[in-house]
């Protein structure tokens, strides 16, 4: 698990607790690729080269225009599942700062055994065990009806061991 910092941030809804990786984590990340304004199919094609990576950082912003739910999987394991109608993220309540924007940003750290996700600048964060479906061949996969991947950045992450 990454070391994180809890801070208070003033939002339009008042003061909120934010959880983000400590700034020193940035020094372990090396930019590999960056794209803007992609369809989910285009983004999925670009991500194929990273299927075998052990450790990655992926920063992305997705926009739901026609979809009511969308997300991002790793070999069938749901890392992000956002349902706009019920305001849930992976089955738990989450409402973005600007619900009318229909956008969700994520900073995702994937290593050999775990996944850590920081949503909308740390306003919502969670971690999970990395347990991909060995029969699933989709790799890193955005899903949702006609979603736009507004921004997609991939970084390698250096090991500290």
PLM region descriptions:
Residues 1-161:
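Beta-rich accessory regions
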């Amino acid at each position: 698990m990454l070391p994180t910092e809890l801070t208070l941030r003033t939002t339009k809804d008042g003061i909120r607790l934010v959880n983000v990786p400590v700034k020193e984590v940035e020094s372990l990340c090396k930019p590999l690729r960056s794209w803007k304004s992609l369809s989910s199919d285009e983004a999925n094609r670009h991500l194929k080269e990273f299927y075998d990576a052990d450790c990655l950082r992926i920063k992305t912003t997705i926009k739901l225009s026609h979809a009511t739910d969308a997300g991002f999987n790793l070999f069938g394991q749901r890392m992000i599942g956002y349902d706009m109608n019920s305001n849930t993220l992976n089955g738990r309540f989450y409402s973005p700062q600007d619900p009318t924007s229909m956008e969700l940003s994520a900073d995702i750290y994937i290593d050999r055994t775990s996944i850590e996700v920081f949503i909308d600048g740390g306003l919502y964060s969670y971690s999970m065990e990395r347990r991909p479906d060995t029969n699933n061949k989709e790799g890193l996969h955005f899903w949702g009806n006609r979603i736009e991947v507004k921004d997609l950045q991939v970084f390698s992450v250096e090991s500290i061991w």
